[in-house]
């Protein structure tokens, strides 16, 4: 009876939580002691100075010492160890930790497995330290080389670290502790009478190691706005959180949480944490700062005048944004990125944490999901309805109800008795299936996974050393300890066909609830004093738990296919490095217009901070979207990197054919737009895989000196060639669209030309949202509609050539087999297209050893903005003429009913993998 009452109380809790986000369930800064302590500090409070500077193993190494000698028998300030390392491409790494030679009570946790191994190969071994006395200082500062244009300065007294330009007025780029807010709570030994416990609501945190927080200020120079530090449902340009005129005086929180129906325009933390901030200013220069730390973090963006008596004397032409970073535990392990261009900063960050995994082609198509498709018959009917309504899709998803009692790696034998046959029927059409696998394991002695994990000692422990027992979807649950490489390898092995009975090569994985979510835990997550392998407290690794779970699952799918095929794993929790293992989505959003709008700054922020493969649930997870909202969401979502429809089980069914013929047509057109542009998207995913530059980008990344773009988060770039403006208000049939730059833009719907550098008011009919191709670009497409992306493999390409004022354009196309890792061994096609002086040329960008070939042809070449009236085109080396026609613009099977006539070269007969030219006569 007692257990039944507990179950009923948890059911009540879950249902109440699902109704709305309850702010009181989660801590504010004032309810978080380390944050409250740090925020009370005043500028100049730091009492540390730098001493004993030397070069050791190519690094600048020094001690941080108390400025005044320790007095009395109170807490003694012990020296800290500082090390500064320099890397190629303008990266500085600063680490500060306890002095291990003084035998601190324990070793602070340093996050492993995030910095890629190749990064250390870029280290510049410092040979010497120069000295310089800064005006007003009583002791010299240490100066080291960073690159030909930059140097790092370690100021001794007062303690400060910054990177500056070498030339001119030696402009600062990024600095740490310029305002003297640095504080490092040193580990101590508990003595009689000490009470280190903390309480929140009904939960008590034993805090066995006591206070150990770190805080410091970071300043960005020549800065108009700062961006990044996801995950929050806020504007793209981060608003100040402290100082004059601030309405919401709450820091941006980084603490992975299971948040239902989250608020928009809130600094409270969501499902992921990436402590990477990017600054951009009027000069067009960009810089960045990254703190590698997995403990809870709180970050203030300080408003101008946050402390009128502090600050650095700067010329009036300079602007600066100050920020304040606070963490509960860990060490200082920070990275300064000098830029100076926007893409330089994201590349520098990617060189530390890695670039995005190259997805399989199917993963870039449309995904259909619901909690839950109830049985095999339901799956078959949904699949057939897509075909009946001529709507392509690539993946059908199954949520938790497909399992045997929420036991992962199992199937409900009544509802899904033939899982392999079900998957094979989808695979026959080129489609895949995804099933959910969460980190909470049902505590059932008859469940093979729980039995094995218990016997092997693979669960996270509670503070007493017993297997942690929390509550989640299956009821009483334990959680796999993903911090251990041994356990991660074991977990990966669960995805083998032998262990995951009923799985096939077309089955992929969804990791949800991996913050981790614990329904009866503090803030719906795991207690901070739970223990991981090696005695690491959960507070130290919390934000990385989902990252390790994602990693282990992805590695498991690679092992399953013996390293041949790329994995696909969707994760809700995120952390630096997540991009190496798969896609993410923005969690449990709501069927509201504001949630549609906020999806854009959320996805832009994720892309800027390395997570290039992201999306939001189309239509909102909670609630029932009105047809107009759902249509507009599909129209925007067709340009998300990750494109998935999903809904809660209490919502009405919302497959695209359930809202009347007209709305079905509109949603089908939006999905067709995505499939038409798949060659362009896939090329952009390859760019992200190589460089780290995101697929979906803020306007200022392409137009860094255009101030009108700096806070624009309702429009976005897809690559460098497309600009998309969403419609975010009910009943809207017009939109104001700012088109940056000096060149023209071409409407994707009809080819109409708009000048750059101004705002245009234009129609936004129900058929589509405003979208434009930038003059000077060439975009590859496929215009034949198929059931799935794999059925498009042999279809011909269309090249859309958007000419600029010089009658020139260029673009790229990347092709591989769409599924394997053979591209790493040179099996791919990479072409560059250039139109100049009336000639379109295709040249090879792949290395000479690249060996993939293709029989696919270029079927159409569409020229937008061609100034003359040509009569024919000459194709070389075939030495043949191609047909030319003037007419309306075609987008897939759609033909513009009005607009500018465009020139189309039909059937030039050239192969996509060969060199050729097409000359306009």
From Swiss-Prot:
Catalysis performed (reactions): Hydrolysis of terminal (1->3)-alpha-D-glucosidic links in (1->3)-alpha-D-glucans
Keywords: Endoplasmic reticulum, Glycoprotein, Glycosidase, Hydrolase, Plant defense, Signal
GO molecular function, one term: glucan 1,3-alpha-glucosidase activity
Pfam families (UniProt xref): Gal_mutarotas_2 (PF13802), Glyco_hydro_31_2nd (PF01055), Glyco_hydro_31_3rd (PF21365)
E.C. code: 3.2.1.84
Deleted gene: phenotype: No visible phenotype under normal growth conditions (permissive temperature of 21 degrees Celsius), but mutant plants have a temperature-sensitive phenotype (when transferred to 30 degrees Celsius) showing radially swollen roots and reduction in cellulose production.
Primary role: Cleaves sequentially the 2 innermost alpha-1,3-linked glucose residues from the Glc(2)Man(9)GlcNAc(2) oligosaccharide precursor of immature glycoproteins. Essential for stable accumulation of the receptor EFR that determines the specific perception of bacterial elongation factor Tu (EF-Tu), a potent elicitor of the defense response to pathogen-associated molecular patterns (PAMPs). Required for sustained activation of EFR-mediated signaling, but not receptor FLS2-mediated signaling elicited by the bacterial flagellin flg22.
Subunit structure, interactors included: Heterodimer of a catalytic alpha subunit (PSL5) and a beta subunit (PSL4).
Protein name: Probable glucan 1,3-alpha-glucosidase
Organism of this sequence: Arabidopsis thaliana (Mouse-ear cress)
